[in-house]
């Protein structure tokens, strides 16, 4: 009998990607985050779809419609809390996924890595426009501050900002288009994810040792399907605990007040997952400089393959580079903390120091460490 799974045009694609896929035998739990991100995306699209059925993208109605979802819609509170905290879960998995890629040298699969960076930008854009939709104080002022950054672009800046706003301030037109963007972007992300997987399956997965694993491969199913299901259960458990017991922990109290253009909140800050970039933006006392630093802090990921100087792919056997990696991780935690603090001393100088360290570690120290390790491993006889 012909195995339909291996011959049917559609099932063959699924089979080659999730069942008979040859996978390295030694990939650790750090390789779970790719599948978890896929689950997060599906979860966000589904909860978002149900929210969109009840949400009204009008400045007079948006805030009330979100309150209506939480109070009057069947399990609306759960759908809304799962969606809001699902975004936090998404970014947690995303940052761990990127960290794994940096630690184990996965960025040397250049096409997969570059598509991943584009995905990061698309997800950040989606999260930003989504945060504006409840039309609370922080939604409104966050939208005003972040879109205003585009006015730093010489010559066309002001025109560009007014074009994005659809008027002379953040208003009804802005909210309506942000809702449209927030609805369409996840499907763009879905398409990019397929391309990301396509390029990954051209080369096969990397592994912790960084050595070519072709001589020792195992089928994806059942070994990694069961491992992914364990990861999924743990993530869903964490998400449900967060969404049911403390759904507002990661949110901003200011967003419980309806948007008021006449009253500015004392501290305007984005959600926790943007704070590191916000701290880098604020550390430069110049609008254009800050915007460029903000962009550079994420675009720098694109040059990781060019900055790789080591003869070894992974950091598994490279103690100096490992130390620098964990310094970079700690630095990102410091930047995240600083991004949530007011602009006053000592936070200003800490933020500036952490920003300099961030760029210096990636551009100078890590390539240098790779070269030193190469020299140390050279036979001296």
Curated annotation (Swiss-Prot):
Signal peptide per UniProt: none
Protein name, UniProt field: Cytochrome b
Any GO molecular function: metal ion binding
GO BP terms in the entry: mitochondrial electron transport, ubiquinol to cytochrome c
Broad class of where this protein is predominantly found: mitochondrion
Amino-acid positions noted as binding heme b b562 in the UniProt annotation, renumbered to this chain: 83, 182
Highest taxon listed in the record's lineage: Eukaryota
Keywords: Electron transport, Heme, Iron, Membrane, Metal-binding, Mitochondrion, Mitochondrion inner membrane, Respiratory chain, Transmembrane, Transmembrane helix, Transport, Ubiquinone
One Pfam family it belongs to: Cytochrom_B_C
Miscellaneous note of the record: Heme 1 (or BL or b562) is low-potential and absorbs at about 562 nm, and heme 2 (or BH or b566) is high-potential and absorbs at about 566 nm.
CDD domains: cytochrome_b_C, Cytochrome_b_N
Cofactor dependence: heme b
Binding site for heme b b566: 97, 196
Stored InterPro entries: Cyt_b/b6_C, Cyt_b/b6_C_sf, Cyt_b/b6_N, Cytb/b6-like_sf, Cytochrome_b, Cytochrome_b_C_euk/bac, Cytochrome_b_N_euk/bac, Di-haem_cyt_TM
Family label: Belongs to the cytochrome b family.
The protein's assembly and partners: The cytochrome bc1 complex contains 11 subunits: 3 respiratory subunits (MT-CYB, CYC1 and UQCRFS1), 2 core proteins (UQCRC1 and UQCRC2) and 6 low-molecular weight proteins (UQCRH/QCR6, UQCRB/QCR7, UQCRQ/QCR8, UQCR10/QCR9, UQCR11/QCR10 and a cleavage product of UQCRFS1). This cytochrome bc1 complex then forms a dimer.
Cellular component per GO, a single term: respiratory chain complex III
Subcellular location: Mitochondrion inner membrane
Annotated binding of a ubiquinone, by residue: 201
Co-factor binding details: Binds 2 heme b groups non-covalently.
């Amino acid at each position: 009998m012909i195995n339909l799974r291996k011959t049917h045009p559609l099932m063959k694609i699924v089979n080659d990607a999730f069942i008979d896929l040859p996978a390295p035998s030694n990939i650790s739990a750090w390789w779970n985050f790719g599948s978890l991100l896929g689950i997060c995306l599906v979860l966000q699209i589904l909860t978002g779809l149900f929210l969109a059925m009840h949400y009204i993208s009008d400045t007079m109605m948006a805030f009330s419609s979100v309150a209506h979802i939480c109070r009057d819609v069947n399990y609306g509170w759960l759908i809304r809390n799962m969606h809001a905290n699902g975004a936090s879960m998404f970014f947690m998995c995303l940052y761990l996924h990127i960290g794994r890629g940096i630690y184990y040298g996965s960025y040397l699969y250049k096409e997969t890595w570059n598509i991943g960076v584009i995905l990061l930008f698309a997800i950040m854009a989606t999260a930003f426009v989504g945060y504006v939709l409840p039309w609370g104080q922080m939604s409104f002022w966050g939208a005003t501050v972040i879109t205003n950054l585009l006015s730093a672009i010489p010559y066309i800046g002001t025109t560009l900002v007014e074009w994005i706003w659809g008027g002379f301030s953040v208003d009804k037109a802005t909210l309506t288009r942000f809702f449209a963007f927030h609805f369409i972007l996840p499907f763009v992300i879905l398409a990019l994810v397929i391309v990301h997987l396509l390029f990954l399956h051209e080369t096969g997965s990397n592994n912790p040792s960084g050595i070519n694993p072709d001589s020792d491969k195992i089928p994806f199913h059942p070994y990694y399907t069961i491992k992914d299901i364990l990861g999924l259960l743990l993530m869903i458990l964490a998400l449900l605990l967060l969404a049911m017991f403390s759904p507002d922990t990661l949110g901003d109290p200011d967003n419980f007040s309806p948007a008021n253009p006449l009253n500015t909140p004392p501290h305007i800050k984005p959600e926790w997952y943007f704070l590191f970039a916000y701290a880098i933006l604020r550390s430069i006392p110049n609008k254009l400089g800050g915007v460029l630093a903000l962009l550079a802090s994420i675009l720098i990921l694109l040059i990781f393959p060019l900055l790789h100087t080591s003869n070894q792919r992974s950091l598994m056997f490279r103690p100096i580079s490992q130390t620098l990696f964990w310094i970079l991780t700690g630095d990102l935690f410091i930047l995240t903390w600083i991004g949530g603090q007011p602009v006053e001393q000592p936070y200003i100088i800490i933020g500036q120091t952490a920003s300099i360290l961030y760029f210096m570690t990636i551009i100078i120290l890590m390539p240098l460490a790779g070269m030193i390790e190469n020299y140390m491993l050279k036979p001296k006889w």
